[in-house]
């Protein structure tokens, strides 16, 4: 019986606009942005940022060095924010409904710039931060590891005390789904932009 639900953020809770982010990063001087930015698992400097190996200012400095020009932090923040959009209120309301019955967790490969935004009232049209919708957030840069590696899942399982056999994992990344399957989670493979409410309701019946 399912008692817990884990959601990914990008591509599940919020839509991911990879092509727009690539365009924005190229506009500020990152010519190979298309090689570094991926829908679920970034590469190079972008992966190091999500893995917690570097902080926001170090990312800005290293990105500037990579681009061969100084990139202001405001431009970095704007480029990152172009990757996602505010989540639809109907999804957020659905999360609140689920929380009356299930424990809800977020497991996300993410960086300080986007999570600091998500933890403010700007996250939703309702003026509520992402923390309002989940029992706990598990964020890659804070945990110093990223999906699809097993370690981030194992750390989450140990900290939360959940049993994978009682937990539904909702994710858009194919490789991340594969790791969760190995660990025994119930799975729903979401598609970026999808309204998955009916599908999740059917699974939970």
Residues covered by each model-derived region:
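Alpha-helical elements of Rossmann-like donor-binding domains used by nucleotide-donor carbohydrate transfer enzymes
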Residues: 20-23, 44, 58, 62, ...
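Alpha-helical packing segments of well-folded alpha/beta enzyme cores
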Residues: 87, 91-94, 156, 176
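Alpha-helical transmembrane segments and their immediate juxtamembrane flanks
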Residues: 91-95, 108-109, 115-116
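Asp-based, Mg2+/Mn2+-dependent phosphohydrolase catalytic module
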Residues: 1-3, 111-112, 116-205
């Amino acid at each position: 019986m399912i008692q817990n639900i884990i959601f990914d953020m990008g591509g599940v809770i919020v839509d991911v606009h990879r092509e727009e982010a690539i365009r924005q990063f190229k506009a500020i001087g990152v010519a190979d942005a298309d090689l570094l930015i991926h829908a679920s698992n970034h590469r190079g400097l972008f992966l190091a940022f999500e893995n917690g190996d570097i902080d926001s200012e170090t990312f800005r400095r290293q990105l500037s060095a990579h681009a061969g020009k100084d990139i202001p932090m405001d431009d970095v923040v704007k480029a990152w924010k172009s990757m996602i959009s505010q989540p639809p209120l109907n999804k957020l309301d659905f999360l609140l409904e689920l929380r009356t019955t299930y424990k809800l967790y977020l497991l996300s490969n993410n960086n300080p710039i986007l999570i600091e935004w998500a933890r403010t009232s700007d996250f939703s049209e309702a003026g509520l931060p992402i923390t309002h919708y989940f029992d706990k957030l598990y964020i890659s840069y804070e945990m110093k590891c990223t999906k699809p590696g097993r370690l981030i899942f194992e750390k989450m399982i140990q900290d939360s005390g959940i049993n994978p056999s009682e937990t539904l994992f909702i994710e858009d990344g194919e490789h991340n789904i594969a790791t969760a399957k190995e660990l025994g989670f119930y799975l729903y493979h979401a598609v970026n932009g999808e309204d998955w409410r009916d599908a999740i309701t059917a699974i939970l019946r």
